[in-house]
């Protein structure tokens, strides 16, 4: 689809397709005048025939083709004219090929069987073709979907190498065979479809295509020379020294065999003591719990029982959290090796195409300027422009988002060349110009200061235009929005509108100021109709998967939130170091990057950075089966999202040692399991040099398959799995990306609108086994879990320069609402069929990975014992009772050892992870704040939603900034019921401290000893809630009065009732009220 095609809107169900042009759209562009003297395949001169006239390859239409291209097409191509599809006739001097008719006027015995020159030339071409197309995927060639045609038209194949055949002298087929298997004799001879009215260079076919084959042949010859040199070094020939150019090439050949990444284990000097302390802590914890359960407090039995139940649950929760961190690792990548292998200077890039997804809903809560910065950082990434496509999903169908993207596309034509010329970081202009650093460091170009000043002025003008659009959007017209040409905006009704697609940049979408092409930028708003379930973000992401497969079909997908910009322009290459690695790429479902944030206060009061999770938990999971998917900053293997199983080796099929020890050996069933995986992945592991099917076969029942493949490839089963879109189904089998070569460009618009229609997913496996999985507001956990259950692994990539940065809700109310959403999703999964406690035991999910997922979904339940344990100190102080009886010196040892083991475990964890003690303490504090508020609400809301069907809506976290100060929003306390429970806990403990001290003062000196243990217990709770208390007292004029009123009222009523109705009052006045001293854990 051309970038100048305008906005395309339509509905498949209503059989509507409308094209809306902008005022800036011009008329029909004049076609390039072809004078017939230039070959339209390679770009060279056509040359002369033996008679001295201009060489004419096709006698029917005289389409300009030079003699070398004519010979190549006859020998190894389609043997047909690209324009009229007529079979080339043999000219005098050309060798005879199969199918030539006897023609008296051109037969010459001298050249009829002279294959030497022509075959040698064709062989050289095939050498280059085979090398260029299979150098990246030597272990598994690329499957051809049809007959290997190269198509022209509106959508160009992002990876032209991904659809070429590999037949030839060094390929898998016969020396003289034509690479077109599975040809139906009833069908016409396959041809290369070319539009004669357009310049072939615009389709990536002509000059570049021919030169790539020639350069590939040269590289193949150099590779053969290196192999011969290696034989001499092995003693099979004379002494040849690797000096000069040969030595450099030999070194390069060695570099191509080196891994592009490696695992960096944590030093044993740090990890071994950590593991020893964990085991000791487990032993101590067992003795501690044994003592607590066997020594009740008789005169405070309810308090003791409550505390013991809480402590047992805390111990269980600690085990779930601790053991997945048993084998943490680090990783490092080698971008130079990636460049040597796939992206050499002066050669066509062999990097695979990548589609980047950006999701947004409400432009008033997710400011268009933030989204624009994210898009600009994507368009200027350090990656081949023809291999990157950016898709922006507007799930709110807002015209403001559409207009801001239009402005962003125009500004990108200036911003992208500036970034690449001066190699600046980050490439989001808002954050680049806001940096308080020496921006002249490492800059040597004299024009940098002048151009930077001009670019900053351009960006400020761009911001003014965006702000004007935002101001205009504040007041919605009664008749709805209209576009520049007066056409009503199709998305005026956000709940009832057609699907919309607009290509802003890309092929034929305009060049940047330096005359270079830009990555494709595509706006997508899926169709929405009343009565259809849209599944929120998960549904929008699945729509992007389908529409991207139809238009560009990148082999890998990278999704980011609209507020997460590329902080590292090489982030995609960092992911490709794993995805394109021959050893692990075929079994890696995604590469997860950590989340890093801007705009957070120095002390990170509410633990927005999540440092402990990303630098400790995620590294621990990376050593097992990989990190969990966190919803953004993740690069996916498209095949994994399609529900396929990974390509497993013998080693992968061996049971995990922990599973083997816990569940017994599975060697008996290994062969059958392997066969099952071979069978299920057969479509991707078969001979990829043979086309999988003709496009016509999709509508004819997929005829012509062998028995094994027909199990998966029947028309009914494929449509039930992927939906009824032949173009999309064809794209799903292009394992290395790219558009199927026989796809008709004229059908792409219709298919793109079709696959984002509201009813496309009906009676398919979308959201169940394919794509983002439905069933929870935290679709990221379910999606990653399903992939891991199939046997895929994931990778945690933490480069020195953070790959992505985003904005976090520094306001406590918004932060708690965000945590509430995450916890609510966990409860939904816990009560669903996808619960990791019982789901996926027949898959390849490893035991520790399963434990990590169980911990991910059960952690909100910890809020119930946590809030009970936080109120216990107040009960003890008010009633003058305690949860621990008088203990002996022997029993006190277990209390002391437990506290020491907890402290040492934390210290050693910080030692190997590099996390600061302040970050660790902030994480502990917010664990209590979130546990006594958001997690508690999530448990009850989740039960209501799943069991009673009462849905609770969540709001998008606001990314807008406050202009009153850098962290002015930090002190805002918006009204939310989530603030009541922690405020009540604070007040109850403060009242308990006052009551306990008053009782000690009135009772004399002997009561101060037991008081210290209770005060320590209460102060420990208050210390964890200190950030919350500081926020309440920070700016009292901004604290909601209703929060204070409700909290004080609940705390006072509860305290007074407890004093009035004391369940621990003994009827015997001579009873001993002394409860002794002790710990509080």
Curated annotation (Swiss-Prot):
Subunit structure: Interacts with CESA3 and CESA6. Assembly with CESA3 and CESA6 is required for functional complex in primary cell wall cellulose synthesis. Interacts with STL1 and STL2, but not with GOT1. Binds to CSI1. Interacts with PAT24/TIP1.
Start-end of Basic and acidic residues biased regions: 127-139
Associated pathway: Glycan metabolism; plant cellulose biosynthesis
Family: Belongs to the glycosyltransferase 2 family. Plant cellulose synthase subfamily.
Region (Disordered): 118-195
Gene this chain is encoded by: CESA1
Entry binding sites for Mn(2+): 537, 561
Cytoplasmic topological domain: 1-270, 321-856, 911-925, 998-1008, 1060-1081
Keyword presence, Transmembrane: yes
Protein name per its UniProtKB record: Cellulose synthase A catalytic subunit 1 [UDP-forming]
GO cellular component, one term: Golgi apparatus
Principal EC category: transferase
Zn-finger segments (RING-type): 39-85
UniProt superkingdom: Eukaryota
Known glycosylation sites: 953
Annotated positions binding Zn(2+) 1: 39, 42, 66, 69
Cofactor note as given: Binds 2 Zn(2+) ions per subunit.
Active site: 395, 780
Location within or outside the cell: Cell membrane
Keywords: Acetylation, Cell membrane, Cell wall biogenesis/degradation, Cellulose biosynthesis, Coiled coil, Glycoprotein, Glycosyltransferase, Lipoprotein, Manganese, Membrane, Metal-binding, Transferase, Transmembrane, Transmembrane helix, Zinc, Zinc-finger
Binding site for Zn(2+) 2: 58, 61, 81, 84
Organism (species): Arabidopsis thaliana
Post-translational modification (record): S-acylated.
Catalysis performed (reactions): [(1->4)-beta-D-glucosyl](n) + UDP-alpha-D-glucose = [(1->4)-beta-D-glucosyl](n+1) + UDP + H(+)
Keyword Glycoprotein: yes
Cofactor: Zn(2+); Mn(2+)
């Amino acid at each position: 689809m051309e970038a100048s095609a305008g906005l395309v809107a339509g509905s498949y169900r209503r059989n509507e397709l409308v094209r809306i042009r902008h005022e800036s759209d011009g008329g029909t562009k004049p076609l390039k005048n072809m004078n017939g003297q230039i070959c339209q395949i390679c770009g060279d001169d056509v040359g002369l025939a033996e008679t001295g006239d201009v060489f004419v390859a096709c006698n029917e239409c005289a389409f300009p083709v030079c003699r070398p291209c004519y010979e190549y097409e006859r020998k190894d191509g389609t043997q047909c004219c690209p324009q009229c599809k007529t079979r080339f006739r043999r000219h005098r001097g050309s060798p005879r090929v199969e199918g030539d008719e006897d023609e008296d006027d051109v037969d010459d015995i001298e050249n009829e069987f002279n294959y030497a020159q022509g075959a040698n030339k064709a062989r050289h071409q095939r050498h280059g073709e085979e090398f260029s197309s299979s150098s990246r995927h030597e272990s598994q060639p690329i499957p051809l979907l049809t007959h290997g045609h190269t198509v022209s038209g509106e959508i160009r194949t992002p990876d032209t190498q991904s659809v070429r055949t590999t037949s030839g002298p060094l390929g898998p087929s016969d020396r003289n065979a034509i690479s077109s298997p599975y040809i139906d004799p009833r069908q016409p001879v396959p041809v290369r479809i070319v539009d004669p009215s357009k310049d072939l260079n615009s389709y990536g076919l002509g000059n570049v295509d021919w030169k790539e084959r020639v350069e590939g042949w040269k590289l193949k010859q150099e590779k053969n020379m290196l192999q011969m040199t290696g034989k001499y070094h092995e003693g099979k020939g004379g002494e040849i020294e690797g000096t000069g150019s040969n030595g450099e090439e030999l070194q390069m050949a060695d570099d191509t065999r080196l891994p592009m990444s490696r695992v960096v284990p944590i030093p044993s000097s740090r990890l071994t003591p950590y593991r020893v302390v964990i085991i000791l802590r487990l032993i101590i914890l067992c003795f501690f719990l044994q003592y607590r359960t066997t020594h009740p407090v008789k005169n405070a039995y309810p308090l003791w029982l409550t505390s013991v139940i809480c402590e047992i649950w805390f111990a269980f929760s600690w085990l779930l959290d601790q053991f997945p961190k048993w084998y943490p690792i680090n990783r490092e990548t080698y971008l130079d090796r990636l460049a040597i292998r796939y992206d050499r200077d002066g050669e066509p890039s062999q990097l695979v195409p990548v589609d980047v997804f950006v999701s947004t809903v409400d432009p008033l809560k997710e400011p268009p300027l933030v989204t624009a910065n994210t898009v600009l950082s994507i368009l200027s990434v350090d990656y081949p422009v023809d291999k990157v496509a950016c898709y922006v999903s507007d799930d709110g169908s807002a015209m403001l988002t559409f207009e801001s993207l239009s402005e962003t596309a125009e500004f990108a034509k200036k911003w992208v060349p500036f970034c690449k010329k001066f190699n600046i970081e980050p490439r989001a202009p808002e954050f680049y110009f806001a940096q308080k650093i020496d921006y002249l460091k490492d800059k040597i170009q004299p024009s940098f200061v002048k151009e930077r000043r001009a670019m900053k002025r351009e960006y400020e003008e761009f911001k003014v235009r965006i702000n004007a659009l935002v101001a205009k959007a504040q007041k919605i017209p009664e008749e709805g929005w209209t576009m520049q040409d007066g056409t009503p905006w199709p998305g005026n009704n956000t709940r009832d509108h057609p699907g919309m697609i607009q290509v802003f940049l890309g092929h034929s979408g305009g060049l940047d100021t330096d005359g270079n092409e830009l990555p494709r930028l595509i706006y997508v708003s899926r169709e929405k109709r009343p009565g259809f379930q849209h599944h929120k973000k998960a549904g929008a992401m699945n729509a992007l998967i389908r529409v991207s497969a139809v238009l560009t079909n990148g082999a890998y997908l990278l999704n980011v939130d609209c507020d997460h910009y590329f902080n590292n322009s090489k982030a995609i290459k960092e992911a490709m170091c794993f995805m394109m690695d021959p050893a692990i790429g075929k079994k890696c479902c995604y590469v997860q990057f950590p989340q890093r944030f801007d705009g957070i206060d120095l002390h990170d009061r509410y633990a927005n950075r999540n440092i402990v999770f990303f630098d400790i938990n995620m590294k621990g999971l990376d050593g097992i089966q990989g990190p969990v998917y966190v919803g953004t900053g993740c690069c996916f293997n498209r095949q994994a999202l399609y529900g396929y199983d990974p390509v497993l080796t013998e080693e992968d099929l061996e049971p995990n040692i922990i599973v083997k020890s816990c569940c017994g050996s599975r060697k008996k069933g290994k062969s059958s399991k392997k066969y099952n995986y071979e069978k299920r992945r057969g479509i991707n592991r078969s001979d990829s040099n043979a086309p999988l099917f003709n496009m016509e076969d999709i509508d004819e029942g997929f005829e012509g398959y062998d028995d094994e493949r027909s199990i998966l490839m029947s028309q009914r089963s494929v449509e039930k799995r992927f939906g009824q879109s032949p173009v999309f189904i064809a794209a799903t089998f292009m394992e290395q990306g790219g558009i199927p070569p026989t796809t008709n460009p004229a059908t792409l618009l219709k298919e793109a609108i079709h696959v984002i229609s509201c009813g496309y997913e009906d009676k398919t496996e979308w959201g169940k086994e394919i794509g983002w999985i439905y069933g929870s507001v935290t679709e990221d956990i379910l999606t990653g879990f399903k992939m891991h259950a199939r046997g895929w692994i994931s990778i945690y990539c933490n480069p020195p320069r953070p790959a992505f940065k985003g904005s976090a809700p520094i306001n406590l109310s918004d932060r708690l609402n965000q945590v509430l959403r995450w916890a609510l999703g966990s409860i939904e999964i816990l009560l669903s069929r996808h619960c990791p406690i019982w789901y996926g035991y027949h898959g390849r999910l490893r035991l520790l990975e399963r434990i990590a997922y169980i911990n991910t979904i059960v952690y909100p339940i910890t809020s119930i014992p946590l809030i009970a344990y936080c109120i216990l100190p107040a009960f003890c102080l008010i009633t003058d009772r305690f949860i621990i009886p008088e203990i002996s010196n022997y029993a006190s040892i277990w209390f002391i050892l437990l506290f020491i083991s907890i402290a040492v475990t934390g210290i050693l964890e910080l030692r190997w992870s590099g996390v600061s003690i302040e970050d660790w303490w902030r994480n502990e504090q917010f664990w209590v704040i979130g546990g006594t508020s958001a997690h508690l609400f999530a448990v009850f809301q989740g039960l209501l939603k799943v069991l009673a069907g009462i849905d609770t809506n969540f709001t998008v976290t606001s990314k807008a900034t406050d202009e009153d100060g850098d962290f002015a929003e930090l002190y805002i306390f918006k009204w939310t019921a989530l603030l009541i429970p922690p405020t009540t806990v604070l007040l109850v403990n403060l009242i308990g401290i006052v009551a306990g001290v008053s009782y000690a003062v009135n009772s004399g000196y002997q009561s101060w000893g037991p008081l210290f243990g209770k005060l320590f217990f209460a102060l420990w709770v208050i210390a964890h809630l200190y950030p919350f208390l500081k926020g309440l007292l920070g700016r009292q004029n901004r604290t909601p009065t209703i929060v204070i009123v409700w909290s004080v009222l609940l705390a006072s009523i509860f305290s007074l009732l407890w004093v009035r109705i004391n369940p621990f009052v003994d009827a015997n006045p001579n009873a001993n009220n002394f409860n002794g001293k002790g710990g509080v854990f």
